[in-house]
Amino acid sequence: MEHRTSAVYKLVPSEIRNLTSEHALGNLRPGQGYKVESIRDWRPDFAFSHIFHFHLEERGRMFSFEEFREWSTLDRFQPMFHTPAWEKIKEAIAGGYSEQEAKNSLRWRIGIAYYSFVREMYVVARFRELGLDARFHPLADALFRTDTWIGDTSVALYIRNDAFRNGKVGRKPPAEKILGGEESGLKFIGLGIPTQPIWGEVHFPDDRAVEDCAGKLRILTAQR
């Protein structure tokens, strides 16, 4: 599907922060969410960033988790996500897991991806509010671990978690490794977000962290 980024650049940070949504993870806990490894590591053919971005552009605004769930069941969108998701559930059941265990892991996988997307959209909107020409495209996100970029500088956002990503530690490869590092002519910067003791909310970076990152980006942009 063709992707044009337009609605993303009209998002308002405060509206994203104040978005009312049901808890994307439900009442699940990590032990339940990560139980089925094939679902924990699932990367659908239509990447989550692709699916969420398509939905955002169609609605013209940030959407709640329940709005996404309803949208994904519409006939014309089922092949993007709903149908392959059920195939993963069937695969897990065939591998010895119960249907509920598979559904729990799927809910967790989707919920984590949704929260990540909301956080990315907030940072893009906040950077633009601060005067930076922050850009987004789902292919850059899915293929190159670039959550947003300004000029020739790639920005990666991540919750600090040694199992997945904490600076250069973790099993998720950073953008600089995928894109060839500074030899590629690109610059790279990360915006790490501390794990927060809250439940049922998006972990947004605090304003100071975003402003500090924006300051570094201005310096890097001026070096071109």
Cite the ranges covered by each PLM segment.
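Nuclease-adjacent, charged terminal/linker segments that flank catalytic cores
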Residues: 1-88
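Solvent-exposed, charged helical/coil patches
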Residues: 77-122
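Short, solvent-exposed polar/charged micro-motifs at secondary-structure junctions
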Residues: 145-149, 200-201
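Catalytic cores of nucleic-acid endonucleases
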Residues: 158-222
